[in-house]
Amino acid sequence: MGVLFDEIAEHGTPTTVHLDRPFDLGDDRRKFGVADLAELVQELAGWLAAAGAGHRDRVAIVKENHWDYDLLSCAAVRIGAVPAKLSDRLPSNTVEALLKRLDPKVLVTTAAVLEHARAAGIDLASFAGTTLVLDGAVPGTLSLDDVRGHTAPGPRRRHDDEPLAVMHTSGTTGTPKLVVHSRNTIIGQLARFETVRYPVIGMRGDDTLVNASAYAHGRTFCWTASAFCLAPREIVVISQQDADRADPVLRAHPPTVMEAPPATYVRFAQLTERLDNPFRRTRLFVSTYDAMHPPTIRSYLTASHRKRPLWMQGWGQSETGPLTFRFHTRSSVDPKHSGRTSRNVGYAVPVKTRLRVVDPDSFEPVPRGRPGLVLAKTAARCLDYVGETDRWQAKHWGGWWITGDLGVRNRDGSVDLLDREVDMVPGLSCLRVEDILEERLPQVLECVVLGQPGKAPLPVVVTVDGELDNASWLRATHDILPLQAPIALTWDQIPRTGTGKVRRLALLQEITATDETHGTGRWT
């Protein structure tokens, strides 16, 4: 990854990158060729070396969302260091806990991140050997003026099984884990698999690929390697979840292939209803991180003017990469198909992944059609958790990885995802109920069903204004098992992870003052 752009530039790859806003690197450009990116990564490597980073040192990166997270990571890899991307959307005390585990030689951040933490009584710079601030001068830290012009040492190779990068899990159930991947696991097993030009879904030379991700997530590090190897004509990077800000960028560069996490698709869905919507040329939508609700998928497939647009849904984890995949068409999410949801996350990735569903207590395999704990076996499994090796080891059983998800293996081999074990409600799939409610309540942006011991499930609905019509709610829930009265909130009132996923335990605690659930949380 340290010489990725150098090698691609040598092949004369004509890909052009367009940004929705400049990088947070003191550079006002919004357009880059591959050779420009190679030069930028070399320059960043010089900055990190000047800040004191070297072979096997950890470099923590905490900043506002943008793809420069991955360019800084490539620069760290180039000098033999190990980058660790941390989302600035994490609470400051969580960032503090992660930095203590990492013990980084260098922290790369911004003045706003430091000030936000300082307001909470936390000095993030105190947890790193040196802190490099990208956008100004902060006492006790280095600024860009202190490191510019430093020549980095030549690229340093490492063994394929040595730590290459650290990325954190979503943290939906508490403090995220720090996942360690090697070149073999994240590049050799994951990125290389994505560089194959598969029929129909494979990248083409005339494609415009748009990515609107959470760039602190490990997915985009892998994506960076695969996307540039496939050499589309244009790559468009969107760093903001504000649909009105994204709209002009999408209209200037209408995507033929679009990738984003579920939360971003939900936020951008309003664009599908606008005149001459920006998704009219899109032939493939890619959703990562989590399953999505059918109404959102339907809105994008309907917006495309292509004859047969596809939605590719992946389910996996930071520790393993993708475990399953499934394709949706306009027909598969047609509301006329009563009861159909997107909880079926498809089939295990061929050749790469094996899945098994077992009883959570005995770990004996359960028959097809019965719910159980989902186990996975893949060569892409991470190496460890930083500072939590015991926790990493506890998620292994007989050579299998314990995902912590509950699911059903169907007769055809596909998997229905039910719930995280920690979020489960006996006799109910919260995720399926959420699918049904979102289908019946088009004014709802998102629905979250929370389980509480001794009480009926608690539904939380997200609307634009935080209001919900009671009559509509009663009609939507007339044939669903008893639920508590719904709580309506706005999008920004919901605690979320860096990828926009709902932090269910935090939400439960905010509403009920308790985080007690039906699940054990043994495999979080």
Region spans (language model):
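Conserved AMP-binding A3 loop
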Residues: K31-A35, L164-A191
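Conserved AMP-binding/adenylation subdomain of ANL enzymes
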Residues: I187-T208, A216-V257, L271-T272
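Gly/Ser/Thr-rich phosphate-binding loop
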Residues: T256-E259, L271-R340, R354
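Conserved C-terminal "lid"/linker of ANL adenylate-forming enzymes
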Residues: V448-L450, V460, S472-T524
